[in-house]
């Protein structure tokens, strides 16, 4: 069972998973703003993962009667780009409408690809992807790589790590203008919006609305959240020295650790020695995936996973918010990043009052685009509705949300 010292150590390690300061001459477009505070004025139009689908975005804005001149604030939950036909068009629309956005995992990789292009390393990294693809065709990599090189982070070297960016990310980076790249790079990791005190109905009687792409770890302050996790997470596991960690959880912990180091190397232009030091740091944090359980116990702080193994983070967040007696200390999270599950907007999948709303409707896979429209009521409170259009542009009916 995890002790208080174990919990303090894990929290410190989670808070410490940040990119170290680097030379500005070699680090392009790293994440500069962790949390940005936004004032609630007019309606909030919070749009799910667009993934370069400009016609769906235009249809959605038309359906919600978006009007910037009337005070509407357009917000994107990240992943505006990649996988679709017109990422430059989507980004330009966001710029033209003074929209707010957060950095999703796709923006992060494309910005890392742009950094590599600026350093003249794109050809080398693309060639490495081609070599990996050829090797995968010839052999079953999972069977031929020794177990220790996969599971023991201290035995991993830089050449064992895949590039952080996919091959397609370089083409996406090249398709965007300098202005569009700079705009994407300027967006924060998290948006925080203070809600009016007059609201009395759950969940809008909470004190804060948060927009984060992938998820958040309960009990960790926003400023201390691990950026990689905020952009990529779906599940949580908990420290438990007596637990027999499943192979699936262990593999995902190791995968996430390597991905963090790949991100570090991409944005830092890091040396082999610096990458080795980061791998050692991650090894100390994750202990090769041992001693973690997917079973939540009161008081434990979760460790984020990219997969849904263990405890789903939205369940953990909803439990935590419902345990806070003062409603004004509670926080609603609107997020994206989970196309496989799709929209998560109602009470049906939560055993407690919902304080999380997932807006990734699967636009990247032809399943339409959705937005949450948050508006002030006559009594000063708030209400919301979910509006969706399908991939062909034929809008579906509005669904009333909590008021």
Regions found by a protein language model. Name each.
Residues 2-91:
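N-terminal active-site segment of His-dependent metallophosphoesterases
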Residues 4-23, 39, 231-403:
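Acidic, His/Gly-rich catalytic cores of divalent-metal-dependent hydrolytic chemistry
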Residues 32-40, 66, 91-94, 191-204, ...:
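A short acidic-Thr-Gly-centered motif at the start of a beta-strand
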Residues 43-51, 209-215, 357-359:
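Active-site-proximal beta-strand elements of phosphoester/diester hydrolases
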Residues 46, 76, 101-102, 210, ...:
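Residue-level marker for buried hydrophobic side chains located in beta-strands
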Residues 49, 79, 94, 104-105, ...:
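Divalent metal-coordination and catalytic microenvironments
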Residues 51-55, 82-85, 106-111, 217-219, ...:
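Active-site environment of divalent metal-dependent phosphoester hydrolases
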Residues 70, 87-247:
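Active-site neighborhood of divalent metal-dependent phosphoester bond hydrolases
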